[in-house]
A protein has these predicted regions:
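Intrinsically disordered, low-complexity Ser/Thr/Pro/Gly-rich regulatory segments
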Residues: 1-202
Length: 202
């Protein structure tokens, strides 16, 4: 089905919309090096499906029939709109050494990722504080976080341990005033196992 049909002047436009979050591992200049929090989702596969299936819907007989019956036109200009955020390895993010595929906009939203062990090791001094992010928090920056929700790294992970997520946890890093300074993913062993296994088969 179409995501969105837009009338733009005398032109009919078919928009395919997607919001995705990908973590880069290995050679991050390649689209197959970017995996979702669920590592079965991969940037190159998503782009391939977007281009070969979703953005061709208007050229199918069913698509043209629907456009004709609903909008009086059998053709539509196609646009793919992909938004979201890329999460770079923490050291690359910290040094601003961002490497990403040439098809990605230079001003893309950025975050970082760490393994559980690296997260605890790097932030075991209790500073900065963090807040776990639920899915409804993923699209917008947090407002000032109450003091009792500003957690040190170990307590943040403890709070996340009760969730059913077993690949990666999304967290926001906070300043002393409880304002978000960045966001990232803390990935667990199963995420690394799946991404490394896929890397060997590419």
């Amino acid at each position: 089905e179409f995501d969105l049909i837009v009338g733009h002047g005398t032109t009919l436009e078919h928009w395919e919309l997607t919001i995705k979050f990908y973590l880069g591992i290995g050679d991050t200049t390649q689209t197959n090096a970017w995996f979702g929090p669920n590592p079965t989702d991969r940037l190159d596969l998503k782009l391939q499906r977007l281009l070969s299936h979703q953005m061709t819907l208007a050229t199918t007989l069913a698509g043209q029939t629907l456009l004709k019956s609903q909008f009086g036109a059998s053709n539509a200009e196609v646009k793919g709109i992909v938004k979201g955020r890329l999460f770079h390895p923490y050291s690359a993010w910290l040094d601003q050494q961002w490497q990403y595929p040439e098809t990605i906009a230079a001003d893309h939203l950025r975050g970082w990722w760490l393994t559980v062990d690296d997260f605890i090791c790097r932030f075991n001094n209790g500073s900065p504080r963090f807040r776990p992010l639920t899915k409804r928090d993923w699209l917008s920056e947090l407002q000032a976080v109450p003091v009792d929700e500003r957690l040190p790294a170990d307590r943040c992970l403890a709070a996340l341990s009760s969730s059913r997520e077993h690949y990666a946890h999304h967290v926001a890093m906070l300043d002393d005033n409880g304002l978000e300074t960045s966001r990232g993913f803390v990935v667990m062993a199963p995420w690394l196992e799946v991404t490394q296994a896929q890397d060997q088969t590419v």
